[in-house]
Amino acid sequence: MAIQYNYGTGRRKSAVARVFIKSGTGVITVNHKPADEYFSRETGRMIIRQPLELTGNSTNLDIMVNIRGGGESGQAGAVRHGITRALIDYDETLKSVLSKAGFVTRDAREVERKKVGFRKARRRKQFSKR
């Protein structure tokens, strides 16, 4: 018999996380590494555990994540979004709790493009009066 996985896709900035959850002992693996090894900063580790701690599923679900693109902060946000969607697929009653915490909503902020004649997206070239 096949193992029953629940799936969720999470996105943040340019990072995309594919999250698979199944009943287990609370092991989180990100790109075939333990989450504590993959995310070097404590804030990243804290962000990915937020939806699990909120719903009380931090010790009874195994999570496998494949992630591509972005930096460490964007990847952590994408994993959180993916875990949230997978938890909703796992148990529909958790949706109200997770949406009140703001985890269901996709953070749509992206990097603004650089404009022609500017140094950065909004930073203009230095003006010289003389």
From Swiss-Prot:
Recorded family membership: Belongs to the universal ribosomal protein uS9 family.
Residue ranges that the Swiss-Prot or TrEMBL entry lists as coiled coil: none
SUPFAM superfamilies linked: Ribosomal protein S5 domain 2-like
GO molecular function: RNA binding; structural constituent of ribosome
Record keyword Ribosomal protein present: yes
Name of the protein this chain belongs to: Small ribosomal subunit protein uS9
InterPro entries hit by this protein: Ribosomal_Su5_D2-typ_SF, Ribosomal_uS9, Ribosomal_uS9_bac/plastid, Ribosomal_uS9_CS, Ribsml_uS5_D2-typ_fold_subgr
GO BP field: translation
Keywords recorded for this protein, A-Z: Ribonucleoprotein, Ribosomal protein
Keyword match Ribosomal protein: yes
Organism: Nitrosomonas eutropha (strain DSM 101675 / C91 / Nm57)
GO cellular component: cytosolic small ribosomal subunit
